[in-house]
Amino acid sequence: MPAHVISSEQQRDRMLHTPIPRLILSLCLPTLATQLISVFYNTADTYFVSKLSTSAAAAVGVVFSLMSIIQAFGFGIGMGCGSIISCSLGGKDNDRADRIGSSAFVFAAAVGLALCAAGLCTLRPLMRLLGSTDTILPYAESYARIILLAAPVMCASFVLSNVLRAEGEATLSMYGMCVGGLLNVGLDPLFIFVFEMGIAGAALATALSQLVSFLILGWQFLHGRSIVRLRLQAVSRSPRDYGQILLIGFPTICRQGFASLSSALLNNAAAAYSDAAVAAVTISNKVYLLVRSMIIGIGQGFQPVAGYNFGAGSKPRTRQAFWFSTLFGTVVCVAGAALIALFPEQIMHFFRDDPEVTRIGRQALLYACAVMPVMAYSTYVNQLYQCLGFHQAATLLASCRNGLLYVPLILLLPGLLGLSGVAMSQPAADFLTFLVSIPFQIWFFRHKLRG
């Protein structure tokens, strides 16, 4: 017990007194790796499955909508408990941190089990709803069935990872994700081509990799390498605790939930043209997501710093954390956009050697590059509100990119501009979200971070 207290005090001192640039870099570099590895799960699947057929490649995009639903609840519960934990540790309330972490873990596993049962019972209509055509449907069903079975483990892993990040142990969080990601890349070609399992092999590789990540993350807690202790006795029986977790995590649930909705709408809009169009937007979205995942990774380093320092009353360090993260994220976005804009055809060809897929995907990538430089700012304004407990504004901002702004655009632009309208809907929503975020950031700094 004394070692635990000393560890907690040392961590609190680090979060409150280490220079902000050095602190955020130390936290965000592991989370960057974690985010990239997380995207790598799907990107590796897309790459190897694309070698089977264009319809199989499109199926990955359809099931991505389903995975976004699972991630919505896993990330939402994880972010909710993570924000409470970082503020609790900043205020020296370790018992509350233990209670929230333990409760969130059990809650996430239960939600994942419910999603698994509901998804398996409605699999075929669900796949059609998410954008499957008759030719895509068999591939989508094979892939989704195995992913659904892994849902409880996936949701619980997101909580374990967020608890470690919330206490400032981003490196420990990274270990599990990195090992799982590397395993996924190795298992994909083995199961798909050597064992001739096809697209089901890609799903099995992802599920097993998620299980390995879960076991590695759980080992950190079982062997006392974390500040927060997960114990069955600490699981809360108070609805108020679960309500708080959901309230703080609700912006993330909205953001990821709308991501699922937007992906389904995009798939359906593209399916009106061809399977090649669905495959093209699937691949271009994976590339776009690689850059966005880096922005989110930096933000996951920023959030515990903001939570600790705001909880301890250090407003100047909270402001500095926001601006440093925004600058760093913008530089990453500009570099990513420049690289993609230079080689759009080569990137598309790397995934699928289909001239029609390359033509459509190239256009989508160039539209995305045009708005990448403004993504970091709007993302961190949203995360600032969320991690400091301003739930209503955070939910509104989280709903803009993939919901309030995107849904009207994806319903309107394809009718006006055809396939080009499908490709430009998400970039247009990203730019409008940036404009909406500006007054929110100005207000917050004037009224909550002054002094």
PLM regions: where:
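Short alpha-helical transmembrane segments in multi-pass integral membrane proteins
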Residues: 1-31, 85-152, 194-250, 306-371, ...
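Transmembrane helical elements of multi-pass membrane transporters/channels
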Residues: 26-45, 146, 180, 209-213, ...
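Hydrophobic/aromatic residues in alpha-helical transmembrane segments
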Residues: 29, 45, 81-82, 122-123, ...
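Helix-terminus/linker motif at the lipid-water interface of multi-pass membrane proteins
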Residues: 36, 40-58, 127-134, 190-197, ...
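Interfacial/gating helices of multi-pass transporter permease domains
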Residues: 48-68, 135-139, 199-204, 241-248, ...
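Small-residue-rich hydrophobic transmembrane alpha-helices
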Residues: 57-117, 154-173, 267, 280-344, ...
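Hydrophobic transmembrane alpha-helices of multi-pass small-molecule transporters
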Residues: 69-72, 184-189, 214-218, 290-293, ...
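Short runs within selected transmembrane alpha-helices of multi-pass transporters and secretion channels
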Residues: 78, 147-165, 173-181, 202-217, ...
